[in-house]
């Protein structure tokens, strides 16, 4: 297996109930029939990108109730889960109970299993890098009713691959307290 250092992909083993790509969304297009879209929980969306060191408007994976089970294929990448979420990370000989708002480093073959949201409906998975997605009307956000956005406007499916076009090499460990965190640009 040839591993390219700054690229990789996630293989979706279980897609989850309602798993899509979301960013800040499309605004000011409703007058021409393009519906609003974007992350449902703006604070957790922004915090996810901030924790992994991304620009705040980069697309993330949004999931509701039960999230995906993903296997990472690539060199190394940092991920974070935000929201009130129960998840596990499976490494070669180890299973870790995950903590939200804390980065974890995934390596070739590691799995992240997002079991369920707890006291929230939505949760977010951000990576230290960028998903390889198609922009439509200035956004990657998926609106499944209108079938617009990346992934042809559809939810993610079992067996699908999520390509990562760029992985940040800065893999420092970060952790924040949700209640004491400050984030700018919240509505």
Range-by-range predicted roles:
Residues 1-187:
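Conserved "landmark" site that anchors the functional core of diverse proteins
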């Amino acid at each position: 297996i040839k591993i390219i250092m700054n690229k990789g992909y996630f293989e979706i083993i279980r897609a989850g109930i309602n798993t899509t790509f979301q960013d800040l969304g499309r605004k000011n297009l409703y007058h021409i029939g393009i519906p609003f879209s974007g992350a449902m929980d703006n604070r957790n969306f922004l915090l996810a990108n901030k924790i992994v060191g991304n620009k705040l408007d980069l697309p993330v994976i949004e999931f509701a109730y039960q999230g995906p089970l993903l296997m990472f294929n690539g060199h190394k990448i940092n991920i974070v889960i935000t929201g009130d979420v129960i998840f596990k990370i499976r490494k070669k000989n180890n299973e870790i109970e995950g903590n939200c708002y804390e980065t974890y480093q995934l390596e070739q073959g590691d799995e992240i299993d997002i079991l369920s949201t707890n006291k929230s409906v939505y949760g977010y998975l951000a990576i230290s890098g960028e998903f390889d997605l198609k922009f439509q009307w200035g956004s990657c956000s998926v609106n499944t009713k209108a079938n617009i956005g990346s992934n042809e406007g559809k939810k993610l499916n079992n067996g699908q691959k999520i390509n990562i076009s760029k992985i940040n090499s800065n893999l420092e460990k970060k952790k924040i307290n949700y209640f004491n965190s400050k984030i700018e640009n919240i509505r």
